[in-house]
């Protein structure tokens, strides 16, 4: 085992990387409220795991979406628990994100030189809300259907580009299969990928600049 470790250590300097990760200075003013961002990340990871598990059974069609969710809840082993954890962690993620934003704002964590960290955080907040909007529609029940119809109809008030934008969101003039397919694709692929990218940028900047000092 020692020889294997030495082989990797010689090429990758694993010990130096480990020392850098474990020996980062933590300011004395840091308290439990500085953990809100980490809790938000944890909720996101739970979302990814439980969401991935449900993709094995969920069917993104207007005729089968609702019945597939019912199947997950009633027939799949621990399916009810997986979906419930997914919903609970979604609510927790939004709550922790809001509290994290307040903490950063109140402690001045958005000020120079951390402006870009704040910008990526705002983008992550928008992505988090987008998760909620797209995920809410996936069961394709009455609530989900009408929520999608209302949300996708909002841009229609924008002059000139309103109607084309609505059609782009819905995939057609009216809400239907194309809309569900778009929302499913956004919820399970596009948004998670963008979130992972911006989270990585967010954490790398925090790692580089350190935690902001007290007011």
Swiss-Prot record:
GO biological process: photosynthesis; respiratory electron transport chain
UniProt keywords, alphabetically: Chloroplast, Electron transport, Heme, Iron, Membrane, Metal-binding, Photosynthesis, Plastid, Thylakoid, Transmembrane, Transmembrane helix, Transport
GO molecular function: electron transporter, transferring electrons within cytochrome b6/f complex of photosystem II activity; metal ion binding; oxidoreductase activity
Cofactor note: Binds 2 heme b groups non-covalently with two histidine residues as axial ligands. Binds one heme group covalently by a single cysteine link with no axial amino acid ligand. This heme was named heme ci.
Record: residues binding heme c: 35
Gene3D superfamilies attached to this UniProt entry: Cytochrome Bc1 Complex, Chain C
Segments traversing the membrane: 32-52, 90-110, 116-136, 186-206
SUPFAM superfamilies per UniProt: Transmembrane di-heme cytochromes (SSF81342)
Residues given in the record as heme b 1 binding sites: 100, 202
Cofactor: heme b; heme c
Annotated binding of heme b 2, by residue: 86, 187
Function: Component of the cytochrome b6-f complex, which mediates electron transfer between photosystem II (PSII) and photosystem I (PSI), cyclic electron flow around PSI, and state transitions.
Further comment found in the protein's record: Heme 1 (or BH or b566) is high-potential and absorbs at about 566 nm, and heme 2 (or BL or b562) is low-potential and absorbs at about 562 nm.
Subunit: The 4 large subunits of the cytochrome b6-f complex are cytochrome b6, subunit IV (17 kDa polypeptide, PetD), cytochrome f and the Rieske protein, while the 4 small subunits are PetG, PetL, PetM and PetN. The complex functions as a dimer.
Protein name, as recorded: Cytochrome b6
UniProt organism field: Marchantia polymorpha
Organism ancestry: Eukaryota, Viridiplantae, Streptophyta, Embryophyta, Marchantiophyta
Underlying gene: petB
């Amino acid at each position: 085992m020692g020889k294997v470790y030495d082989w990797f250590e010689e090429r990758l300097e694993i010990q130096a990387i480990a020392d850098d990760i474990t020996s980062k200075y933590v300011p004395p003013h840091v308290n439990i409220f500085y953990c809100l961002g980490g809790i938000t990340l944890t909720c996101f990871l739970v979302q990814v795991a439980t969401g991935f598990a449900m993709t094995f059974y969920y069917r993104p069609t207007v005729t089968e979406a609702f019945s597939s969710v019912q199947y997950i809840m009633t027939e799949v082993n621990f399916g009810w628990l997986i979906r419930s954890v997914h919903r609970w962690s979604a609510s927790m993620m939004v709550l922790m994100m809001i509290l994290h934003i307040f903490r950063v704002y109140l402690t001045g964590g958005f000020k120079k030189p951390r402006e870009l960290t704040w910008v990526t955080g705002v983008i992550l907040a928008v992505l988090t809300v987008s998760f909620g909007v797209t995920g809410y529609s996936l069961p394709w029940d009455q609530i989900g259907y009408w929520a999608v119809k209302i949300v996708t109809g909002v841009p229609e008030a924008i002059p000139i580009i309103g109607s084309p934008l609505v059609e782009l969101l819905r995939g057609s003039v009216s809400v239907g299969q194309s809309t569900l397919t778009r929302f499913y694709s956004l919820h399970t692929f596009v948004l998670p990928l963008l979130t992972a990218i911006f989270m990585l940028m967010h954490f790398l900047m925090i790692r580089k600049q350190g935690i902001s000092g007290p007011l």
